[in-house]
Amino acid sequence: MKKYPLNVLAMALFYVAAGLNHFINPAFYLPLIPRYFPYQTLINWSSGVIEVVLGLLLIPTFSRKWAAFGIMAMLIAFIPSHVYFIEVNSCAGDLCVPEWIGWFRLVMIHPLLVYWAWSNRNA
């Protein structure tokens, strides 16, 4: 049996679970999609599919590099959603958090997720 780096498997599981959650709990994600984007439901479903596919593509070594780059591109594409979350007072539907959490997600968590993908591209 081939051994996979635990970090890569954790990342794959993270993105597959996050992607599936777009279908299980769309009410969580829909308020995070900026209102100025049309087709919020399509965006939510597409994001879920992309996250699941990229998460699965992290597992085989032959596709890991491209999956990592895809995740980085996806995370960059999600930046407007993070900015929008701050613009709407860090509220997504009925869930409201202190504004600093919205900024922390944008300035710290988001770059760390990009770095995580970058660090796993050749793992």
Residue ranges and their predicted role:
Residues M1-A123:
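Membrane-interface extramembranous regions
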